[in-house]
């Protein structure tokens, strides 16, 4: 009788050790940026500022109804904007990341609408999409922590 009881106690001890070793403590989500994270994000700041000024140049092309240059400008000087925004999104805090990704997708949806409307010479649609794109980009820039 002692043998099964000892065996049962040994099995319970192994099972408890296994369960404790497999359990995990819930990881805390960081609520503030570390100095290294801010430094990494700030490396993108000049590039994002340049892209913001390029958005103003796009507005000038739209205002002048220069459709060919508008389409070319979207695919040329603004071509790297998506990659930069995605890289920045990945470095933000988790609570800001999803919003940044959504704003990036929205901005590029707006640029596609501008592209299509410019090809169709639809000034009203181009200007509406441009204003929405600028708003999305400004909202994205608000997510970037200040140094």
Task: Place the predicted regions along the sequence by residue.
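C-terminal motif of bacterial Sec signal peptides marking the signal peptidase cleavage site
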Residues: 18-21
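Immediate post-signal-peptide N-terminus of mature secreted/exported proteins
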Residues: 23-72
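Short helix-adjacent coil turns
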Residues: 65-69, 114-128
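C-terminal partner/receptor-binding element of secreted or periplasmic proteins
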Residues: 121, 127-147
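A structural signal for well-ordered alpha-helices, especially hydrophobic packing surfaces
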Residues: 52-62, 82-89, 111-118, 137-144
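Short, charged, amphipathic alpha-helical segments
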Residues: 71-76, 97-105, 124-134
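Short, solvent-exposed, charged loop/turn and helix-capping segments
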Residues: 81-101
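Bacterial N-terminal signal peptides that target proteins for export
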Residues: 1-11
